[in-house]
């Protein structure tokens, strides 16, 4: 993705300024494989048997637009977004985040339990919901304040071929939960009992 190239260019420039050889920079770039281990929260893709989860730290309009550009080419029967607002940003920024989400996703789950940054959970949820409704007043939207419960709900209700795009600002917890579900599936365990 273009924005990944934009992210690596400053690292290459810094390495060059610090006197690193071109061969060492080349070796570093060739052995760098984006993954949940090396880049937690940056386009971490988890392919389950019947659906896919993409975990990313997109948390502002620019990040969300870059994520949209990346996911627009991904095939899915339905795209479900799990989003949260940002308390130290303007109302307009949170509205825009909601509006971009309404463009990106067939269904949206708003969660808002951590890192409120000066606003209340209800204020942030309303800002996102207002932004969603500005773009599409009929967009299917579910409010589940707990990130853990929102992820669990999305995975439990995933239909075949769906893509769940999880925009998280608490990467370790979200990553642990998704990896736990993936591990359960790979062991043949039911993720959820009916």
Regions found by a protein language model. Give the residues of each.
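ATP-dependent carboxylate-amine ligase
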Residues: 1, 10-194
